[in-house]
């Protein structure tokens, strides 16, 4: 394979996968008519604009940066599906304000991953990395060394006047000796923290806290806990080394302390990981890589510049798109709803399905195909639904099946009609770790037996011959013989495991026998440790059920441990 073909294949692989700060998600075009995708693009774009305006005008947003960035990535995918240009990076920063910035705030374009970082750094020199401080962006304007304006970022061109709050922020020098006649600085007002570790504590709502204090009409005591990190000095010294040294002399020490020269992408990777774990005096959400060489301030615009880039930390919340909704019937007759999502990789685990519980819970969530949800990994790596962050505009009606006739003692057989889902769930439980723990036997195998009508009740598999098992497509003679031997050995499993495999509501002692269990009265069960009156009734209903007794009779003929007839 030549190099050109290899590059093409790599491009195709990359173009069909998006990386969102450590979470991998497939990026396929939705199977929608052109009219619908246009409607959905417009709806998502409007919502993102509203959130962005709230962020820049009020210092907070109804959604986290993680969610916003991932939904913005989704918008790009949808736009590319229609051949529309990506306008997300060139759009003006939304916001409001009446006071003109001497130099526009450019904002930052975000790098998706290490590959994008390497590509951007190629051919550039004199690069530095800084923590991306999570706070409120401002402009500081000094005339003759005196602070004359403190402006919010606003829309990048105009901002609000917060100058009256500046005297209450001790981190902002009110006068700088030997300063240039006109000095314009851009930076971040942040909440001073004591050894904040981003990897452990996250954002702790620090930005909103600072924004709230700045927007109050009367000065807030919280302003005394606000620091400032200067990240831009338009038309300042040409080298970063001189720039940070002068900033420190002028009373802005954080820039010098947290600016590091980098030679390669590996240096950036190391600093990013270090600052993610290290105790810091501020909240961060990534790193910023910037080059010394930058245009004169008069050329800056309120759109991301090309001389600095942000590389954010892995998201704490991961978005998945709901592809379909499946209704499953468990072995006890309880229905559950499983969301099928476009595959997303969280940490080292690929997520494709998420169990969200009962139909009632699903209705409360109001989830439809196309909706976007946030997922997290709970105990044992099981995916958990956290929230619905975006609902599609066009919602297809989905009707849940009626499961009223199913219960704890229904469907020990494949028939009657409608029993197959619960029957399959019983078989999966029977062969699983909670039952007989038959290695390598799961839902796929049982489904094939049902499909080929080789099994009609919960224990009918004990009668199967190697030849019958081998008749299933994909199972050869050798594997069929192995499965047959596993089934025969299952007869020697402890009686207590057999009871659990059949669906018995409570563990009993291993040395019990079916006849002994059957003769116990309701009151005897109720007085046993850990059972009680309610569970005792469930046990008696189970033991007295004709289908269960038929299964026990069959197991007796098969000489299964504990079910043999005693004289």
From Swiss-Prot:
A family per Pfam: DNA_ligase_aden
EC number in record: 6.5.1.2
Keywords from the UniProt entry: DNA damage, DNA repair, DNA replication, Ligase, NAD
Reaction catalysed by this enzyme: NAD(+) + (deoxyribonucleotide)n-3'-hydroxyl + 5'-phospho-(deoxyribonucleotide)m = (deoxyribonucleotide)n+m + AMP + beta-nicotinamide D-nucleotide
GO BP terms, alphabetized: DNA repair; DNA replication
Residues annotated as the enzyme's active site: 132
The keyword Hydrolase is annotated on this UniProt entry: no
Keyword flag DNA repair: yes
GO molecular function: DNA ligase (NAD+) activity
Family per record: Belongs to the NAD-dependent DNA ligase family. LigB subfamily.
Biological function: Catalyzes the formation of phosphodiester linkages between 5'-phosphoryl and 3'-hydroxyl groups in double-stranded DNA using NAD as a coenzyme and as the energy source for the reaction.
Record-given protein name: DNA ligase B
Record organism: Yersinia pestis
């Amino acid at each position: 394979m030549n190099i050109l073909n290899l590059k093409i294949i790599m491009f195709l692989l990359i173009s069909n996968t998006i990386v969102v700060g450590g979470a991998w998600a497939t990026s396929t075009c939705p199977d929608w008519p052109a009219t619908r995708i246009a409607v959905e693009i417009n709806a998502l774009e409007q919502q993102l604009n509203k959130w962005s305006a709230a962020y820049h005008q009020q210092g907070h947003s109804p959604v986290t940066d993680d969610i916003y960035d991932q939904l913005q990535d989704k918008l790009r995918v949808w736009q590319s599906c229609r051949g529309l240009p990506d306008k997300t990076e060139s759009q003006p920063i939304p916001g409001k304000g009446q006071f003109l910035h001497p130099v526009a705030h450019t904002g930052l374009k975000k790098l998706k991953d290490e590959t994008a970082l390497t590509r951007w750094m190629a051919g550039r020199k004199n690069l530095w990395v800084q923590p991306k401080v999570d706070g409120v962006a401002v402009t500081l304007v000094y005339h003759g060394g005196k602070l004359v304006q403190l402006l919010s970022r606003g829309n990048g061109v105009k901002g609000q006047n917060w100058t009256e709050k500046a005297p209450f922020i001790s981190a902002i020098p009110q006068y700088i000796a030997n300063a240039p006649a006109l000095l314009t600085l851009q930076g971040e007002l942040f909440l001073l923290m004591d050894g904040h570790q981003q990897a452990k504590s996250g954002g702790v709502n620090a930005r909103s806290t600072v924004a709230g204090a700045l927007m109050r009409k009367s000065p807030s005591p919280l302003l005394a806990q606000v620091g400032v990190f200067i990240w831009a000095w338009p038309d300042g010294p040409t080298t970063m080394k001189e720039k940070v040294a002068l900033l420190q002399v002028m009373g802005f020490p954080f820039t010098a302390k947290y600016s590091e020269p980098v030679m390669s992408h590996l240096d950036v990777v190391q600093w990013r990981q270090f600052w993610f774990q290290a105790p810091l005096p501020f909240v961060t959400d990534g790193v910023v890589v910037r080059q010394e060489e930058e245009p004169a301030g008069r050329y800056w615009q309120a759109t991301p510049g090309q001389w600095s880039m942000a590389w954010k930390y892995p998201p704490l919340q991961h978005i998945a798109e709901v592809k379909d909704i499946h209704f499953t019937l468990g072995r006890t007759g309880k229905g559950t709803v499983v969301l099928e999502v476009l595959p997303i990789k969280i940490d080292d685990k690929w997520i494709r399905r998420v169990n969200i519980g009962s139909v009632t819970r699903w209705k409360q969530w109001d989830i439809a195909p196309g909706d976007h949800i946030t997922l997290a990994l709970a105990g044992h790596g099981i995916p958990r639904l956290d929230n619905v962050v975006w609902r599609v505009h066009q919602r297809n009606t989905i009707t849940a099946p009626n499961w009223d006739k199913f219960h704890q003692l229904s469907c020990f057989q494949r028939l009657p009609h409608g029993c197959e889902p619960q029957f399959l769930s019983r078989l999966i439980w029977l062969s699983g770790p909670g039952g007989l723990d038959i290695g390598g036997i799961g839902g796929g195998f049982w489904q094939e037996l049902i499909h080929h009508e080789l099994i009609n009740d919960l224990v009918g598999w004990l009668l199967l011959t190697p030849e019958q098992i081998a008749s299933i497509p994909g199972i050869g003679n050798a594997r069929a013989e192995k499965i047959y031997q596993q089934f025969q050995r299952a007869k020697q499993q402890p009686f207590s495991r057999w009871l659990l495999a059949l669906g018995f509501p409570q563990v009993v002692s291993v040395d019990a026998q079916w006849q002994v269990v059957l003769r116990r009265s309701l009151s005897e069960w109720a007085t046993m440790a850990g059972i009680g009156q309610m569970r005792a009734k469930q046990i008696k209903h189970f033991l007295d059920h004709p289908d269960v007794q038929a299964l026990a009779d069959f197991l007796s003929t098969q000489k299964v441990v504990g079910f043999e007839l005693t004289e």
